[in-house]
Amino acid sequence: MRPIVLSALLIGLLAASRAEAQQRPLITEDPETIGSGLVLIEAGVDLQRDIFLPVSGLTGNLLRLPTVGVSFGVSSIAEIQIDGAFYNRFSVTDRDPLAPLAFLLDFEGDQTTGLEDLVIGTKLRLVPEAPGRPAIGLRFATKLPFASNESGLGLGTTDFHMALLVGKTVQSIRVVGNGGLSILGDPTRGDEQNNVMTYGLSLARAVAQGVEVVGEVNGRLDMGEGDPPPGTGNRGAIRFGGRVTRGTVRIDGGVILGLTPRDPSFGLTGGFTWVFRGFTIP
């Protein structure tokens, strides 16, 4: 059923009109940067159902409020990104007491809360888009372990991500692709890691002045032999929705459909993005 939904989504988006470099409610990174001296602030709320956390053994529904991202345009081709969430609330519907770190859980009842891990990254646009070629960029990011093992929401690992970003407007369609490598720490052993391939493909089309419909498939694939360390296996989700831009503010909403047992069976996301001039580059 989920592959059919994805096929319908991608076919529908191929009717497109011009769309600008995209982000919320998607997570596939456009190679275009926000611009020198500009600041981008995005915030939103996610509600995701039937998530499985294999390290803590918890299954349930996750509320992320608010999700926050801030980007600083430090030059015409580079930006610094900071992303995270101030408050995560996980409503537990099932537990696996034999999960690797279930013995560390320290909360009462069927609800746990906590911060989310912080991600700090840098994006560089290497090649600008031209009529005969796509824009090409690179992104490097590090995930810092702010979420705790005791809440069941954190892995306690520091991860590194790097990806090649490609984007092209073809006639009226904005197509963005990501491909890269993530080095994920083993939450049960400090001397082990797992390398996974990351991927993303997004499309965007305008249906009216300042109104777009968007969609993507994004995730990661374990490339190793045997069972991966807990919490480092395959992930994936389809996202589709819309966004409305008025001046320097964009409002968005979307639907999330997970592709693996660890991802949500269904989710909703909504938020806004605001871009303004924050400083002058000397």
Question: What are these regions, as identified by a protein language model?
Answer:
Residues 1-6:
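Bacterial N-terminal signal peptides that target proteins for export
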